[in-house]
Curated annotation (Swiss-Prot):
Lineage, broadest ranks: Eukaryota, Metazoa, Chordata, Craniata, Vertebrata
Protein name: SKA complex subunit 3
A GO term from the CC aspect: outer kinetochore
Stretches the record annotates as Binds the NDC80 complex: 102-410
Phosphoserine modification, residue list: 34, 119, 138, 154, 158, 289, 324, 352
PANTHER family the record matches: SPINDLE AND KINETOCHORE-ASSOCIATED PROTEIN 3
Length: 411
């Protein structure tokens, strides 16, 4: 129902109510209605309030209708703009496709789709026409009215306005006939499988990593590196030469110790005699003791309290040489343990060393003032005016970039 019609109906009912109430009030004023209890002013106020609520409701309904009208108008405008854009895009696409030989279908072919008829034979004819059109589209070698007779071609630079970048003109492929196309299709189709021939499947290879063994040998470390390679070679040759020398000495003289000097031969090189040791665990105690560390402080001399020439070395009896050629004797090795009583007997009191001028840490002598600058002299004369400058002190000229003390507030 239209809100305006409902509003008029309510307004008509209100007018009739007002007429009846006005007549009743007039009768009450004349004294005809003795049972009237409410005052006429209250009734009039109620009527005015009802009319005001009705007006508010009508205004709200009108606002809602106006908003809906505006939204519908806005939707129509947006739809028109979108339709115009779509039509422009379709037009551009049609022009772009026409450059490559595309032609739009005729209206007569698509007329059967929009034609609505109640007869069944006509619908069957229309379906047959549609199926024929689909077959023509799928088969490009059969010419028809709906499909363009020109074959599709690849895009060229001339289509985009870039003719000057063409280097060489490639001749187009000659048009193929229907027979050649059929032969190519037959050649491309794979041969049919013969059901009588059974192809055996390749069995899967199961990987067993537990039973896998590496065929390459393991890499073992023989203790040969860039630091020990030359030493191993030298000492190996030395041991071979030492074996020959020792056997000759033992045969000539028995019980004599081998000399500590380097041994040479005609077909061998010099071997350091005092560094050869027996390769046994019991000979560890014959290792030479290291030298004590030396601490050096610049500008400070510490007198030495120990003289290494006074140390008394004690020679311990060495183990008897065995008859086997693999063992070697230790020669000229400093013993690891020394007798403490004999060591401290040779200690002497160190002589007192003279202290040089560099080592004297006394208070330095005060500097001698030979000249007083001019700015310092002005400050001294300002505080004590009776002070007379000595004759030997010369006033030096003011240096560049210095400021006087007289105008100190304006610095």
């Amino acid at each position: 129902m239209n809100p305006i019609q409902s509003f008029h109906c309510k307004l008509r009912g209100l007018a009739t109510t007002l007429d009846s109430e006005t007549a009743r009030l007039l009768r009450a004023l004349d004294g005809e209605d003795s049972d009237f209890e409410d005052s006429p002013g209250r009734i009039l106020h109620d009527l005015h309030s009802e009319v005001q609520t009705l007006k508010d409701n009508v205004n709200a309904l009108l606002d809602e209708a106006r908003l809906e009208n505006q939204e519908s108008t806005r939707f129509k405008k947006a739809t028109k703009i979108l339709m115009e854009k779509n039509s422009a895009d379709v037009r551009k696409l049609r022009e772009f496709f026409q450059k490559y030989g595309y032609q739009a279908r005729d209206k007569e072919d698509s007329g059967c789709e929009h034609r609505v008829n109640n007869s069944t034979p006509e619908l069957a004819v229309c379906k047959d026409i549609q199926k024929a059109g689909v077959k023509e589209l799928s088969d490009p070698c059969v010419p028809s009215g709906s499909v363009s007779e020109e074959p599709l071609r690849s895009p060229q630079l001339s289509d985009f306005g870039l003719q000057r970048y063409i280097i060489s003109q490639v001749p187009a492929n000659p048009p193929q006939t229907a027979a050649s196309l059929k032969e190519e299709r037959v050649a491309e189709t794979p041969p049919a499988k013969d059901p009588s021939v059974q192809v055996l499947k390749t069995p899967r290879c199961a990987l067993r990593m537990d039973d896998f063994e590496c065929e390459t040998p393991k890499l073992e470390h023989f203790g040969i590196s860039e630091h020990t390679m030359c030493l191993n070679e030298d000492y190996t040759m030395g041991l071979k030469n030492m074996k020959n020398i020792k056997s000759s000495l033992l045969s000539g003289v028995s019980g004599e110790a081998i000399g500590t000097g380097p041994v040479t031969s005609d077909n061998s090189f010099a071997i350091p005699g005092p560094i050869i040791q027996q390769m046994e665990e019991n000979d560890v105690e014959y290792v030479s003791s290291p030298l004590p560390p030396k601490f050096c402080t610049p500008g400070l001399k510490i007198p030495s309290t120990m003289d290494r020439t006074d140390l008394v070395s004690i020679d311990y009896p060495l183990s008897k040489p065995n008859s086997s050629s693999t063992d070697l004797e230790i020669k000229d090795c400093v013993p690891l343990i020394l007798n403490s009583d004999e060591c401290y007997q040779s200690f002497a009191e160190p002589p007192s060393s003279a202290i040089t001028s560099c080592e004297n840490f006394a208070t330095p002598s005060p500097p001698k003032v030979t000249a007083i600058p001019e700015d310092i002299l002005q400050m001294i004369t300002k505080h004590s005016s009776n002070l007379a400058s000595p004759l030997d002190v010369k006033v030096m000229p003011r240096r560049k970039g210095t400021r006087g003390a007289a105008n100190k507030e304006n610095w």
